Swiss-Prot record:
Biological process according to GO: dTDP biosynthetic process; dTTP biosynthetic process; dUDP biosynthetic process
Positions that bind ATP: G7, I8, D9, G10, A11, G12, K13, S14
Source domain of life: Archaea
Protein name as it appears in the record: Probable thymidylate kinase
Protein species of origin: Methanobrevibacter smithii (strain ATCC 35061 / DSM 861 / OCM 144 / PS)
Pfam families linked: Thymidylate_kin
Keywords: ATP-binding, Kinase, Nucleotide biosynthesis, Nucleotide-binding, Transferase
Gene: tmk
Entry similarity comment: Belongs to the thymidylate kinase family.
GO molecular function: ATP binding; dTMP kinase activity
Amino acid sequence: MYIVFEGIDGAGKSTQINLLKDWLDQNGFDVETVVEPTDSEVGKLIRKILQRPDATTDRIQKTLGLLFAADRMLIMDKLNDDSKVILSDRSFISSLAYQEPAEWIEQINKYAKEPDLVLLLDVDVKTSVNRCSKEDEFENEEFLSKVKANYLDLISNFNHEIIDASTGVNKVSTDIKKAVAPYMGICPDCIR
C-alpha cells in the first residue's frame, strides 16, 4: 500500500506521517516512510536550490521539476515493495502542484508510481506561513496560494481524502486514521 501525504508547506505532513506510522506499527503493519526530496545527492541539491531567493522563478521551477523527477526514480524500488505500507511525504503530485507547465511535468514523471491513496492536508496559506520557520519557508504567500489552488484542482484525479489540517494535531491524526483504516482492514468506526 502506497499512501502519499500532500499539502502546502506547514500543513503538518511530517508530524502526521510519524503519528500514522506509529499507529500502523502498533497494528502489526510493516511500515516504511519516504520523504521527497530524498537524502540522495540529487535530493540534497534540490534542498540547496529551494533555499535560493529566486526559487519560485519559472526557470528554477523547471530545473526543480527535472531534479525531483530524477530523485523520484532513485526510490522506485522502495515504492514498489508491496510487502510494506509506504508512507510518503510528497510525490509527483507535488511537482504537478508546484511546477509548470503541467503537461511537461506529467511527461517527465510518466514512470512515477501512482499512489493507492492520497491524503491532502488542507490548511489556509496564512496558517502555513505561521507554522513555517523563516529558514524553512521556501515560498511566499502568493506562490503558496497558487499551489494550494493547484492541489485542489488536481486531487480529483487520484484516490484521495481531503483532511482539514487546521484543527489540532490529535483531531487531524484521528481523521487520517479513519480515512486509512478501511484500506488496512480496520473498522473506521472503532477509531477514537
